[in-house]
Amino acid sequence: MAKKIRVLIIDDSASIRQTLTHVLEQDPDIEIMAVASDPFMAARKLQEEIPDVITLDVEMPRMDGITFLRKLMSQRPIPVVMCSSLTEAGSETLLQALEAGAVDVILKSKIGAADSLSDDAMRIREVVKSASHARLSNVRRAAGTIRSASVEGPAKKLTADVMLPPPTGRAMAKTTEMVVCVGASTGGTEALREFLEELPANAPGMVIVQHMPEKFTAAFAKRLNGLCEVEVKEAVDGDPVLRGHVLIAPGDKHMLLERQGARYYVSVKTGPLVSRHRPSVDVLFRSAARSAGSNAMGIIMTGMGDDGARGMLEMHQAGAYTVAQDEASSVVFGMPKEAIAKGGVDRILPLDQIAREVLITQQKF
């Protein structure tokens, strides 16, 4: 029998502890090792047993979750999934948690609404199981993502066809500008920071989908903008894709790459979950295959699941140059692995070599 994933739940809310316990125990691969109402009780339990994953509340009496997380990561690193409310102030706190080493985040609004069979409950279980496989050596450098825990079940999984306009069949002229499309999930927030910090101010125009809920992407883009030479912002419908500028897909919206003549711009739309996500990497990549073809470069980074795999294959088939982050540098080698398995990847590189590859490719345009 396979070893179960043992979870320690730390939250000052009895109802959250009870709901999380109920939701997680519906999965036969998960068992609750213990629950604790604050970090001090959790510390005592950690002296007795070590879990595979910890779920950690952000706001608690006596010691907040971020302080406990930092102490834990400096003394005994364990995969941690943060639990937080969906607020703009909370988004800043959660970015600090990801910097401190949290693997992932789930929203309390989804926990409170979840029953054992709901889509939200499925997502919570998926996040915890994924965290148990995280490479902690990479988590400290490329720490996590933020997840809304809002996905469809496998039977309802939709493809990017629901968002893409019909293909025009028109020939695509080569332009002198290159556009870079990036997709990431678990581990992506810090992986993207490391990647973007290495790019100069005249880097190619770039569009990015990082799996995040609404209200978090604006804070994420603002944080990156303060760290990088390129200009980074949350995308707005109709924004042009310009050299030296990076557009981040807004949470809970899909982002498509569009083209008018030699000009690229983004279309930001509402719509159903695609590949179990909104925003979806597949939506961006498949739109890039149609609108940019060989003028594009596709990059798929650390993350669980298969979002982006089909889109990267279509980019590859349309003549784009495609790169996947390697397993050794990924926090979770899911999305890159699926893209490689589909045959849509031209080159596999460690994270610290991807920015250089972008600049080398740019010289060919």
Curated annotation (Swiss-Prot):
CheB-type methylesterase domain span: 173-359
Subcellular location per the Swiss-Prot or TrEMBL entry: Cytoplasm
Entries under SMART domains matching the protein: REC
Top EC class, one word: hydrolase
Gene3D superfamilies the UniProt entry points to: 3.40.50.2300, Methylesterase CheB, C-terminal domain
EC number: 3.1.1.61, 3.5.1.44
BP terms from Gene Ontology: chemotaxis
Mod. after translation: Phosphorylated by CheA. Phosphorylation of the N-terminal regulatory domain activates the methylesterase activity.
Keywords associated with the record: Chemotaxis, Cytoplasm, Hydrolase, Phosphoprotein
Top-rank lineage group of the source organism: Bacteria
Entry similarity comment: Belongs to the CheB family.
Annotated function: Involved in chemotaxis. Part of a chemotaxis signal transduction system that modulates chemotaxis in response to various stimuli. Catalyzes the demethylation of specific methylglutamate residues introduced into the chemoreceptors (methyl-accepting chemotaxis proteins or MCP) by CheR. Also mediates the irreversible deamidation of specific glutamine residues to glutamic acid.
HAMAP family: CheB_chemtxs
Full protein name: Protein-glutamate methylesterase/protein-glutamine glutaminase 2
UniProt source species: Rhizobium johnstonii (strain DSM 114642 / LMG 32736 / 3841) (Rhizobium leguminosarum bv. viciae)
